[in-house]
Amino acid sequence: MRTLLIRYILWRNDGDPSYYNDDFEKLMLLDELVDDSDVCTLIKNMRMTLSDGPLLDRLNQPVNNVEDVKRMIAISAKVARDIGERPEIRWEESFTILFRMIETYFDDLMIDLYGEK
């Protein structure tokens, strides 16, 4: 699951078609959980610098169930899409934060999205 999410969010950032995976279809459905007009506000609330990827912990939004997890993934993907591709982005920090917030719900997420662990 970690590898899939990393590949998906990086793909959303650069849009390289050779990086596309059919498993991304289910993850793209999560986009409807976050309104495009909210992304600028979310980026502002994350107080990001030019070298930051999505910093979800700065939103102070709890993750208490699989729906919260799906929203965090959607926020990460949309922020990654909108910040643009730059070589200096510190993706490791962003992914560490994301996974720390959602790892408790990985199995539930897999079952919800794909019907199995």
From Swiss-Prot:
InterPro entries for the chain: Orthopox_N1, Poxvirus_Bcl-2-like, Poxvirus_sf
Its job: Bcl-2-like protein which contributes to virulence by preventing host NF-kappa-B activation in response to pro-inflammatory stimuli such as TNF-alpha or IL1B.
Protein name: Protein OPG035
Domain of life: Viruses
Expression induction: Expressed in the early phase of the viral replicative cycle.
Keywords in alphabetical order: Early protein, Host-virus interaction, Inhibition of host NF-kappa-B by virus, Modulation of host cell apoptosis by virus, Viral immunoevasion
Organism per entry: Variola virus (isolate Human/India/Ind3/1967) (VARV)
Family affiliation: Belongs to the poxviridae OPG035 family.
The keyword Metal-binding is annotated on this UniProt entry: no
Any one GO biological process: symbiont-mediated suppression of host NF-kappaB cascade
Pfam families assigned to the protein according to its UniProt record, in alphabetical order: Poxv_Bcl-2-like (PF06227)
